[in-house]
């Protein structure tokens, strides 16, 4: 996503993971396969990779900078979270790099807003440091 401004507020984002990921039947197990195929045929490559029969999934964090505050919206998957299985076990360095590329440090964040509490929206809210879970922000 290209950064944009609304008045004196800057909105940008950075990605933890982006690309073909899971088959449609895994994401929507109760859907009718024939109906799903008809809809998938209409989807652009940014949403569905037909060659691999995989939905494209993007995990990203939005950064809202106001003159007074830095706000994060959703904190992606995070690291070392128990019970998530290998499907969410991918390198998280891109998220850390994205944070740095925005010139941000964890202590620069004033507010974190999670749109909802699924694992891919609140993962970096905490980090495992020295065997203990600590708040990231």
List each language-model region with its residue ranges.
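Metallo-beta-lactamase
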Residues: 1-100, 108-120
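Metal-dependent catalytic neighborhoods of phosphoester/phosphodiester hydrolases
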Residues: 122-132
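Acidic, His- and aromatic-enriched active-site or binding-groove loops in soluble protein domains
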Residues: 133-137
């Amino acid at each position: 996503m290209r950064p944009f401004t609304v008045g004196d507020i800057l909105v940008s984002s950075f990605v933890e993971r982006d690309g073909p990921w899971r088959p449609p039947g895994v994401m929507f197990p109760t859907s009718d396969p024939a109906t799903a195929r008809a809809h998938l045929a209409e989807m652009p490559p940014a949403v569905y990779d037909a060659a691999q029969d995989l939905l494209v999934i993007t995990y990203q964090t939005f950064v809202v900078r106001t003159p007074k505050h830095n706000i994060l919206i959703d904190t992606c998957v995070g690291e070392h979270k128990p019970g998530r299985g290998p499907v969410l076990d991918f390198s998280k360095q891109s998220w850390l790099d994205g944070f740095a590329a925005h010139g941000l440090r964890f202590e620069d964040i004033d507010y974190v807003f999670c749109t909802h509490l699924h694992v891919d929206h609140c993962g970096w809210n905490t980090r495992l440091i020295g065997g203990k879970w600590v708040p990231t922000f």
